[in-house]
Amino acid sequence: SVDDLREHGHCLTDVRIRESTIPGAGQGLFANRDFLPGEVVTISPVLALPKNVVENSVHDSVLKNYCFAEADSDLALFPINYGPLINHSPEPNVAIEWFDWSPAVNAMSAKYNGGQSLGHDLKQADKLGMGAQELYSASFAPLDIAYKATHSIKKGDEIFVSYGSAWQQAWDRYTARSRSTEQQKSGRPMFRQYMALPAGSYPRNWI
């Protein structure tokens, strides 16, 4: 019912895609309604990939730029759906956290399916407890992240998230090199740098 969707669902049309307000950034994600602090702006399922697959992809691939990773882990996480369209800002208006669908799945299963599962209803703790090989071989995107508003967002505002301090430092070095005489002669190499999840997001079994 509509009431169930309002209680348990998240509308894809709450956001929309258009040209970013950052010059040269390409597309960005924008609010299609007002959001209060703490509201979920959008959700991305997450695919788990081995780092060596990401880093040994074809030469002109920038897949690495769209993945989260930790220095001490061989696991890279690729958000699908709207996640890769959210640009970086040192002053973000959303923050990332793990999202747990199991309460919604269980509530809908109890109401409409006699308590039988309507889908993959592993609890968040179970998913985060999966080992790397389990995540790689899963037949579905086993993890989800939510982008939550950190303060009020108005309809039409661009959505920004922090890619982390390591990403910002790498970007600053890259843009500084691109302005040098030597760099202008040799050509502009492609920028590649993992994004970072908030500190403590990777469970110990992934590291």
Each PLM stretch: what is its role?
Residues 1-207:
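Conserved catalytic SET/PR domain of SAM-dependent protein methyltransferases, capturing the structural core
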